[in-house]
């Protein structure tokens, strides 16, 4: 094996090239690779964090939806209860008004009845007076006329 000067020159040139590369080229490449690895790790961590946040947001939205449905159901039930109460109150008021009208009508009928009785009594008195004057005209017997008047009043 002949070692000549060309081979030694190539070895020296290669060593200089390796040294130059290690000193000037390799550190920026290594730094770029490290930055790239960090960015990828950050991206993966960010994606994992976003995935967890999405799950939390889904659970929260499901809980909010469940609460909203429960509240809506409660509002509907309360509205139904209030409507039922209003309906019952309206029925009670209508019944009370009907009873009041009925009572007023009965009182009015009773007043009309009393008035009619009074008119009948007045008519009776007038008829009795007419009968009495006829009896007096027919006979002067007081006992007989009194008896006739009493019978007449009793019949009426």
Curated annotation (Swiss-Prot):
UniProt keywords (A-Z) are: ATP synthesis, Cell inner membrane, Cell membrane, CF(0), Hydrogen ion transport, Ion transport, Membrane, Transmembrane, Transmembrane helix, Transport
Read off the Pfam families from this record: ATP-synt_B (PF00430)
Alphabetical GO CC annotations of the entry are: plasma membrane; proton-transporting ATP synthase complex
Sorted alphabetically, which InterPro entries does this protein's record hold?
A: ATP_synth_B-like_membr_sf, ATP_synth_b/b'su_bac/chlpt, ATP_synth_F0_bsu_bac, ATP_synthase_B_chain
Question: Is the Ribonucleoprotein keyword given for this protein?
Answer: no
Establish whether keyword Cytoplasm is in the entry.
Answer: no
What membrane topology term does the record carry? Single-pass membrane protein
Localized where?
Cell inner membrane
TM spans, by residue? 5-27
The family database entries (CDD domains) matched by this protein are listed as: ATP-synt_Fo_b (cd06503)
Any idea which GO molecular function terms this record carries?
proton-transporting ATP synthase activity, rotational mechanism; proton-transporting ATPase activity, rotational mechanism
Record note on quaternary structure: F-type ATPases have 2 components, F(1) - the catalytic core - and F(0) - the membrane proton channel. F(1) has five subunits: alpha(3), beta(3), gamma(1), delta(1), epsilon(1). F(0) has three main subunits: a(1), b(2) and c(10-14). The alpha and beta chains form an alternating ring which encloses part of the gamma chain. F(1) is attached to F(0) by a central stalk formed by the gamma and epsilon chains, while a peripheral stalk is formed by the delta and b chains.
* HAMAP family according to UniProt: ATP_synth_b_bprime
Its biological function?
A: F(1)F(0) ATP synthase produces ATP from ADP in the presence of a proton or sodium gradient. F-type ATPases consist of two structural domains, F(1) containing the extramembraneous catalytic core and F(0) containing the membrane proton channel, linked together by a central stalk and a peripheral stalk. During catalysis, ATP synthesis in the catalytic domain of F(1) is coupled via a rotary mechanism of the central stalk subunits to proton translocation.
UniProt family annotation: Belongs to the ATPase B chain family.
* Protein name from the UniProt record: ATP synthase subunit b
Q: Which organism is it from?
A: Francisella tularensis subsp. tularensis (strain WY96-3418)
- The gene behind this protein is atpF
């Amino acid at each position: 094996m002949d070692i000549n000067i060309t081979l030694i020159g190539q070895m020296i040139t290669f060593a200089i090239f390796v040294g130059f590369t290690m000193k000037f080229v390799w550190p920026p490449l290594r730094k770029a690779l490290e930055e790239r690895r960090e960015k990828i790790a950050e991206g993966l961590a960010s994606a994992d964090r976003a995935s967890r946040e999405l799950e939390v947001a889904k659970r929260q939205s499901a809980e909010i939806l469940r609460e909203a449905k429960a509240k809506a159901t409660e509002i509907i039930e309360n509205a139904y209860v209030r409507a039922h109460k209003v309906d019952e109150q309206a029925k009670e008021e209508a019944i009370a008004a009907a009873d009041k009208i009925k009572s007023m009508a009965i009182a009015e009928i009773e007043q009309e009845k009393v008035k009619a009785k009074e008119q009948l009594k007045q008519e009776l008195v007038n008829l009795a007076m007419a009968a009495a004057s006829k009896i007096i005209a027919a006979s002067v017997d007081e006992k007989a006329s009194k008896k006739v008047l009493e019978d007449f009043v009793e019949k009426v």
